[in-house]
Amino acid sequence: MFINRLTGGFMSDKVTINDIAKLAGVSKTTVSFYLNGKFDKMSEETKNRLEDVIARTNYYPNTIARSLNYKQTHLIGVVIGDITNSFANQIVKGIDEYSRQKGYQMIVGSSGYSLDNERRCITGMAAMGVDGFIVQPTVHFETMWKEIGIHKPIAYFDSPNPVSNELWVKTNNYEAVYDATEQLVQEGYEHFVIITADPYILETRMERNRGFTDCLDRNKKSYDVILADEKTTAAMLEEKLVPYLKSDTPTAVFVCNNWLLDKAYLVLRNYKDLIPNKIGLIGFDSLEWTELVTPSITTIVQPAYEEGQAAARILIDRIENQNQEVPNWILHCRINQRDSTKRNTK
């Protein structure tokens, strides 16, 4: 027996389709339609309610996973942290193009870096019968994955757990940020400010922060940290950042997330006469606007498209029981130095 997390009552060890129908307040036929991906005559409210009940009771892995293991749908479930940013767009493009070449289609979900949303995406996609998953995981994803017990191939990208035995592909974030920070030190910047989203949600963010701080500690340089999130406006960022810009000390601003770079630029363009000699600016990813503005902005460019292709390749190889590809890939970023960090010290 176990306690139903929805009602607090007791249920049998084996959750049945009748239990799901009762908890969701729908018929067994409606549950069956949901499990088979037939949503055309189903309201969004009903769909969401069933998704929630199935996720909370772990119904899928305990009852239908085994039956789905024996048929192939040529569907791949892709879970992205934030599908709106340019990095994610290129990742998805890489996954899609490689998958289509191999006869697969993808279903994409955005988790918003929430473990609960990751669970919902995974269980919902599993109910549709996907052959495997490609996931940008939060730091606690692997624990959840083991708990729900879905026996499907999975490939991590961008933020793999370093002790995971699963497939993964990532970029060399630590080394890239360390090298870029070292370049800033060599340019003559003496103080540093890092603007970052919560670094403890994604392994990638932690690697970038470690690369930044390790380099500065080694060079005995001072630095400050500004935390921001999706709700941070340019005005809010200005209030935090400007106090660090009033010193005569050459200061470099490192923006760790591509979706924060435009906000940092809006703040710093009011000081563009001081860029790059007094103020430096560096960010992440190959954003088109960064080379069009004056001064142009130095960026660390990730091979996002190639990372998406690699993730699809190693997953499909696993699905099809092939061993042609190395199961773990580390791709290299490059530093695209532009005017925002080229100090004229001569």
Where are the predicted features?
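N-terminal helix-turn-helix DNA-binding module of bacterial transcription factors
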Residues: 1-73
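Amphipathic helical "hinge" segments at domain boundaries
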Residues: 10, 44-48, 57-124, 128-132, ...
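Short beta-strand elements in bilobed, periplasmic/extracellular small-molecule ligand-binding domains
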Residues: 99-110, 194, 213-234
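Flexible loop/hinge segments that line or gate small-molecule binding clefts
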Residues: 135-179, 199, 259, 285-297
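Hydrophobic alpha-helical segments within soluble ligand-binding/sensing domains
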Residues: 169-194, 234-242, 261, 302-321
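An alpha-beta-alpha
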Residues: 180-223, 327-342
